[in-house]
Amino acid sequence: MLASLQKSYTATMIQMLIDQKKLSMNTKLSQFYPSIRYSNKITIRNLLDHTSGIQMGEPAPKTMLTNDSSAVMWAINHLKSTGRMQWNYTNANYILLAGIITKVTNQSYMSVLSENILKPLKLRNTAELDSNTINSAAKTYNFGNNVTLHAMSYDLASSELGCGNLYTTPSDYLKFVSALEDNSLLSISSLNELSRNHETAYSAGFYYFSNGQRADGIDNGYYNFYYDDKSEHANMILMLNKGVSDSQGRAMIQELGNIIAS
């Protein structure tokens, strides 16, 4: 499962809609979901950068949600909008962005993703959560005194539209980030607009540092880490089905980078 690494796919589709003049970074959330408190102050930029003032944990529905609109409504019914435009990481921002994509295009999230990213890049091993991926995906494990299967919550995954309901492989993910870097998906100016953030060092699914960027995705027993060291011209992807902490995962992938550089 791609987990939060999926956020950059959602952000890329938002930028594509901006390039088509169907949205702007200043478009207000109230245009699509006016019932959300302070939505008249929350912009697309705020949602992309987690500065919307929205807070939400990861509540799991009792049964799998079967369509995009039900996932968005689940988030709307469980989020809290505070009006404080400070950085606060929450999946709710990207679920709302995914919902905006469906409203602007009048298509499902997966249809837009397939048309604009999966098919052009030939990402044949990337798919949404459904019965086929459930049966074919790598299982996750807990390691203690005994090795046990991790109890995967498909109900939770079904609620994470745009931020945690995709499966992929390291090779497919590499094709995606490489396409961003070589401007196959977005022009230089569009990518610069999407990734511009000077306050939080986070924008559109990636954390930025002096010589590169990284992304982390931990969900449902899957642990995914991406590290792009531009000074060494190295992309590193680590996808695990066994638990490690966020800091351990980043340390592991940085150590891989050191080995490559040596």
Regions found by a protein language model. Name each.
Residues 18, 181, 257-261:
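Short amphipathic alpha-helical signal-transduction/dimerization elements
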Residues 1-46, 81-90, 161-164, 233-237:
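Short active-site loop at a secondary-structure junction
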Residues 16-18, 219, 230-231, 242:
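A generic beta-sheet turn/junction motif
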Residues 225-227, 232-243:
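Short, well-ordered beta-strand elements
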Residues 41-220, 225:
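Short, surface-exposed loop or secondary-structure junction motifs
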Residues 157, 243-244:
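A short acidic/small-residue loop/turn micro-motif
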Residues 14, 176-177, 256:
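Hydrophobic "lid"/C-terminal helical patch
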Residues 244-262:
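Short, gly/Ser/Thr-rich active-site loops of penicillin-recognizing serine hydrolases
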